From Swiss-Prot:
Quaternary context: Has multiple subunits with at least A(3), B(3), C, D, E, F, H, I and proteolipid K(x).
Name recorded for this polypeptide: A-type ATP synthase subunit C
SUPFAM superfamilies: V-type ATP synthase subunit C (SSF103486)
Organism of provenance: Pyrococcus horikoshii (strain ATCC 700860 / DSM 12428 / JCM 9974 / NBRC 100139 / OT-3)
UniProt keyword list: ATP synthesis, Cell membrane, Hydrogen ion transport, Ion transport, Membrane, Transport
Chain's gene name: atpC
Membrane topology: Peripheral membrane protein
PANTHER family named in the record: V-TYPE ATP SYNTHASE SUBUNIT C
Family from the record: Belongs to the V-ATPase V0D/AC39 subunit family.
Amino acid sequence: MEISTLTTILDTTLAVIFTWVAYKTGQIIWKYTPYSYPNARIRAMEARLLTDQRFSELAESKTLQNFVVSLEDTDYSPRLASLQSYNLYEIERALDLSLVDLVELMIKIMPKRIRGLFEILLEEWDVRNITNVIKAKLSNLPPQDFIIPAGRMFPKVKAMVESKTMEEILVILEGTEYEEPLRKLLLKEIDLQAFELELYKIYYSKLLKYASSRKGEEKLISEEFIKMLIDYRNISIILRAKLSGMPSEEIKSLLIPGGMLSRAVLESMLSSEDVMMALGELEGTRYGDALKDVREAVEGGRIDKVEEALRRYILNRMKELSQFYPLSVAVALTYLLERESEVRKLKAVAKLIEDKAKPEKIKELIGEMA
């Protein structure tokens, strides 16, 4: 073989190798670099999460004013600093708004290709606000006391608050995905509970549709996250409904499609004779180990202990994913769950302080929460 031929082959081979290396390098840069800044920022915020020692100190606050002052050096300070009075309603509202601020921050700093997930997560406030306005209107209560200035439809929510009739609200929601469920409610085709569930079905359907449109790790992580949230709601619905004696067919209509639990498991839970048997159907699932210590609590009607165990499982699973995929959306979703857990605990501390509970009792109850 002539030298010129060998040189040509060598040049071609090197060109192919360099092209492949450049392609792979480009893939890595596209895949991971956009997460470097947001995840570094989130890790810094994660370091500021409240420790058990800090919660013990908060339990000693004695008054809500002291409780708020004790949080001045935390990420809750911007919202708590604007309080007009130190009452439980205002404090809980400020804590909720701190979570809204967090999701809005994620929308700003996360890579464009996953930003839509957080935009849809923000829509849960649309569901909450719309549901709360309808509930308040039907109960002749002031709806403005039950809404949070958050969500993508807040201008419409404000218009709903000012409306005089339910028909006006239907006009306000015209053209949105929430119009039809409200129409069914007004026609008495569904009750208020079913109306709320219809809104949540729309919400989770949008989340799943978005997650399934992603690629690679982003699809894997976001789909598992959303499906676990759906399982959480479905398990809670089934167990609470079983406890209240609701017929299986009625429970089935309340379930949200798209979770990780198989249809067979859900059907077995639905056909179970009682709440304990329904819980037993989860033993062979991914949630089995997490729920093995709550049977006694469930026998006493404490479904909240199941919910705590499931929240703890979901958080731990997301932590695993964030460790396995350190430059991914798992880091942001894990931190969001951590902050939601922290807010639940802070609300509980505030409520117990208002109720004049002893610090020792507050510490005991908070230590059990998830």
